[in-house]
Amino acid sequence: MSTAIDAGPARGGARIEIVNPATGAVIRDVAEDSPETVARKFARAVRGQKEWARVRIDDRKACVTRFGQLAQERIEDLAATLSGEMGKPITQSRNEVRGLQARIDFFLANVHKVLSEEEAGADADGRLEERISYEPIGVVGNVSAWNYPYFVGSNVFIPALLTGNAVLYKPSEYASLTGLKIAELMQEAGVPADVFQLVLGGGGAGAALLDQPLAGIFFTGSYATGRKIAEAAARRLMRVQLE
């Protein structure tokens, strides 16, 4: 599996300026994904997901546990990055990162229940037993919001990773640096780079993500964009969740 975070196209492609909304100052710029780079990331995610699904659940839990620990250890840095790019007061940013841990703990405590086999029934003489087992669905797209990227994103990418799926995570273009921080923490925690990948950019990058044959798309954002996603997902019978 790849071990490097791919944050967009090669030098010379489109760039996104990250602007501090409080001061108007440009913090930095980042590479914006093109349809070609999104397609390449999807292909890597497909390969990575197959390997990730074979990883023992306790080992996947260990990676997610470590991700949570790293986030709590680096609250000040993560909060400063979040406030700097989207304008939230620093106390609210700290509280958001702190609150991330409760979400992680919930999913860690319940993933075994979600993945446990269920007895669906048996015939009268007991010779036939029906059971339901659960498997990962594959590669999912996670399009997150600008205002609470840790809360909104983690509600999708944490359970997705725990249950053996790969994630193409598209933060809002107004929370791109926070997306990079999340990806760095994931990799440091042991999640393979192909299994959790960033898609950076605005509507064009989001459209390119939706063009991939995803197993599911999870979106938080505007009504207008959500409607377009729902229509596209319906045409392909793709799993979809909108907020």
Functional labels for PLM-detected ranges:
Residues V139, G190-E243:
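Conserved NAD(P)+-binding/catalytic subdomain of aldehyde/semialdehyde dehydrogenases
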Residues G121-A193, L242:
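Conserved small-residue-rich beta-alpha loop and adjacent elements
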Residues I104, G179-I182, L209, I229:
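Hydrophobic packing residues within well-ordered alpha-helices of enzyme cores
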Residues A31, V143, L168-S172, V199, ...:
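Active-site-adjacent beta-strand anchor residues
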Residues M1-L128:
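N-terminal Rossmann-like NAD(P)+-binding subdomain of aldehyde/semialdehyde dehydrogenases
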Residues E36, E73, D77, K88, ...:
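Short alpha-helical
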Residues A45-G48, A160, G179, A233:
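Small-residue (primarily alanine) positions within well-ordered alpha-helices
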